[in-house]
Structure formats: structure tokens, C-alpha cells
């Protein structure tokens, strides 16, 4: 597993020519399925500021390798604000405070979110992720999606 906090700031390079495309700024996630759908980038000179997860060849200790130098723009109107995960308020579906999101552990090959780390030291399974909004990350309670 890799941690988002260790991935942010890593250079993103093209597999074609090893040229730096940008640096990792964050993740775009799909709560349904707890999957990373894209990487948000900083420092991109040409093109968009997001690369689709399917174009990520490897997430290593020193860099992220992507298969294309042209990055796809994240066109959703609710994009970047909703995807700044670290430090975002963490709430249960009942509205109870669960601290803030301190980190996200994910599988660097599949993009599956394994664990959400709360500022209170709780480890919340990724399958409990219900939503990511501008205000908070929401996790399920009860049954398989409980805290």
C-alpha cells in the first residue's frame, strides 16, 4: 500500500521520454467502489491538469510514470475543491464528526482505496467511503460500511 501523503509532490514523468509532466497534487476518487480515477497534477506546462488512472503505468518511491504526455483535463464542474482530500472534515453518514482525513492508503497498481486514516487515529476501510464533497468526506456506519 502507498499513502497519499507520501505521493503528493512526487514528479510525474512520461514513459515515452522520461520528461517530467508535472507533480502529484492529489487524487480524484470515485466513492462508489472506493477507486482512484485520476491523479491531479501541479506544474503542468501544456494541456490539462489531470491524468486518468488508466494512463498511470507505475507509482514508485521516486516518481509516478504515465503512458501519455498529454494529460486529460478533469472537466467535472465539482472537480478540484472536492478532491483535496487531506485535512478535509470526516463525517459519518449520520453527521457525526470523525476528525479530519489525515491520510489515504491505496493500492498503487489497482487504484483501490484500502484505508482512510483519521486524525483521531482510526483506520476506516475504504469500502465505507460514501462521498467526497467540498465540505467533507462521508463514511458509512452500520453493517459493512460502519465505523
List the predicted regions and their residue ranges.
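Peripheral interaction segments used for macromolecular assembly
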Residues: 1-147
Amino acid at each position: 500500500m502507498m499513502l497519499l501523503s507520501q505521493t503528493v509532490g512526487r514528479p510525474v514523468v512520461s514513459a515515452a521520454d522520461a520528461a517530467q509532466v508535472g507533480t502529484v497534487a492529489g487524487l480524484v476518487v470515485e466513492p462508489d467502489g472506493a477507486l482512484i480515477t485520476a491523479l491531479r497534477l501541479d506544474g503542468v506546462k501544456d494541456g490539462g491538469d489531470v491524468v486518468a488512472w488508466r494512463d498511470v503505468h507505475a507509482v514508485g518511491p521516486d516518481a509516478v510514470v504515465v503512458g501519455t504526455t498529454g494529460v486529460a483535463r478533469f472537466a467535472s464542474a465539482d472537480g478540484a475543491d472536492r478532491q483535496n482530500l487531506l485535512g478535509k472534515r470526516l463525517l459519518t453518514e449520520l453527521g457525526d464528526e470523525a476528525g479530519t482525513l489525515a491520510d489515504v492508503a491505496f493500492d498503487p497498481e489497482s487504484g483501490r482505496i484500502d484505508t482512510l486514516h483519521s486524525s483521531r487515529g482510526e483506520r476506516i476501510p475504504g469500502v465505507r467511503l460514501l462521498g467526497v464533497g467540498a465540505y467533507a468526506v462521508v463514511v458509512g456506519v452500520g453493517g459493512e460500511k460502519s465505523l
